[in-house]
Amino acid sequence: MKITLLTVGKLGRMVEAQLAVDYASRATASGRALAVGPVEIVEVEARKPGKAAEAEVLRPHLEGAYVIACDEHGKVRPSRAFAEHVGRLRDDGHRRLVFLIGGADGLDPSILSTANETLAFGPQTWPHALARAMLAEQVYRAVTILAGSPYHRD
């Protein structure tokens, strides 16, 4: 199952961007034997400001995918439950899993309503760059849990 972290905005050479890329690479390497991956980060930018314009550039990337939108009102899952959910999606035959991270103002309601589900990293608000790194780390952690690796400790 291919996993895409689809994000609005480009982080360039920020340390958080490099951290996210590192975790995505680790998840890709660790997930091969589990039929999970590759894990990629795709950055998109709208030509006009606003959530509606961002929705237009996100929409083409969502076709045929199981979509989980990161949103402050989403479901909070502990790491092990998150891993089990990713494993279930794979086992149910989903070929593509896309996680969405919106811009500074979040995701357009039209995108949120088309997502299969929403995910939150707790009740706090996180900077975009940190949310991306945290999501990439959680995907890596999920892969290691599915693999039975000692990376995650309960």
From Swiss-Prot:
GO terms for molecular function: rRNA (pseudouridine-N3-)-methyltransferase activity. It is an enzyme of class 2 (transferase). Its main location: cytoplasm. Pfam families: SPOUT_MTase (PF02590). It is found in: Cytoplasm. It comes from the Bacteria. Keywords: Cytoplasm, Methyltransferase, rRNA processing, S-adenosyl-L-methionine, Transferase. Belongs to the RNA methyltransferase RlmH family. This is Ribosomal RNA large subunit methyltransferase H. The gene is rlmH.
